[in-house]
A protein has these predicted regions:
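Conserved short histidine dyad/triad with adjacent acidic residue
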Residues: 32-50, 72-77, 85-90
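A short, N-terminal "cap"/entry segment at the start of jelly-roll beta-barrel domains
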Residues: 1-32, 73-77, 83, 119-136
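Ligand-binding loop in jelly-roll beta-barrel domains
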Residues: 71-73, 86-116
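Extracellular/periplasmic catalytic domains that process cell-envelope and extracellular macromolecules
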Residues: 25-28, 51, 58, 75, ...
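Short, solvent-exposed loop/turn elements at domain surfaces
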Residues: 44-47, 67, 115-119
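Glycine- and acidic-residue-biased ligand/ion/polar-headgroup-sensing regions
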Residues: 51-71, 80
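Short, well-ordered beta-strand segments in beta-rich or mixed alpha/beta enzyme
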Residues: 60, 78-81, 106-110
Length: 136
């Protein structure tokens, strides 16, 4: 949705890139914004969770293969906004979808003091939860 700014001197606009129902935000959470760069063909980070809460992202350059537990993998391109639940949801893929160019994205995360930003998922747990993964 494009916001109208014609009532002001400025010709600036505000474009809403994503709108999400308020996910659970943990008590005492702080917010961290990170820039992630993947070289061409990079596999990204191994399957993980965001223990502190949801993450909200914006693709700056390139393409990313993105997959969350319970959702089919999808390709995100420069200019796309995305988000993923925190807590127990597994983030399976954030790979560079291209072998010829890098990809980069900004991610804003809710974090809980004393917990890591990302928490890796074990092979055993991936096997236990394989029925929750959507493959197409």
């Amino acid at each position: 949705m494009l916001q109208d700014t014609t009532d002001s001197e400025s010709k600036s606009t505000i474009e809403v890139l994503q709108e999400v129902r308020s996910p659970l935000i943990p008590e005492n959470a702080h917010v961290m914004t990170v820039l992630i760069n993947h070289p061409p063909g990079a596999a990204g980070y191994p399957p993980h969770r965001l223990p502190g809460g949801p993450g909200f992202g914006y693709m700056i350059d390139g393409e990313m293969l993105f997959e969350l537990e319970g959702e089919a993998p999808r390709v995100l391109r420069a200019g796309d906004a995305f988000w993923g639940l925190g807590g127990d949801v597994i983030h399976y893929q954030n790979a560079n979808n291209r072998t010829d160019i890098p990809c980069s994205f900004v991610l804003t995360l809710f974090c809980v003091p004393g917990q890591p930003m990302l928490e890796r998922v074990t092979e055993e747990e991936l096997e236990e939860r394989k029925g929750l993964r959507v493959t197409s």
